[in-house]
């Protein structure tokens, strides 16, 4: 059990130094903050998927995946002739 506490202590120290120690926990100032941020981001994505449906959520991800620092996903899709069906983005009633 002590090794688990020691590992958490090391991770907490790294988090306080600005290192990301939990996937999705970027921006937290401690290990606990990293864990809470990661959990909230995951839960937010799941909620959005439920609201939009699997198809809409996937389509939104396709568009987001096309974005770059220079242009949005929508701009790039239009320029390259990639069809993005934004009607799928609507939340379910």
UniProtKB/Swiss-Prot annotation:
Induction: By abscisic acid (ABA) and osmotic stress.
Gene Ontology biological process terms from the UniProt entry: response to abscisic acid
Region Disordered, residue ranges: 1-93
Note in the entry: Wheat contains at least 10 different genes for Em protein.
Family membership: Belongs to the small hydrophilic plant seed protein family.
PANTHER family: EM PROTEIN, EM-LIKE PROTEIN GEA1
Keywords: Stress response
Protein's recorded name: Em protein H2
A Pfam family it matches: LEA_5
Phylogenetic placement of the source organism: Eukaryota, Viridiplantae, Streptophyta, Embryophyta, Tracheophyta
Extent of Basic and acidic residues compositional bias: 9-19, 31-52, 73-93
Lineage: superkingdom: Eukaryota
InterPro entries: LEA_5 (IPR038956), Sm_Hydphi_plant_seed_CS (IPR022377), Small_hydrophilic_seed_prot (IPR000389)
Role according to the record: It is thought to provide protection for the cytoplasm during the desiccation stage of embryo development.
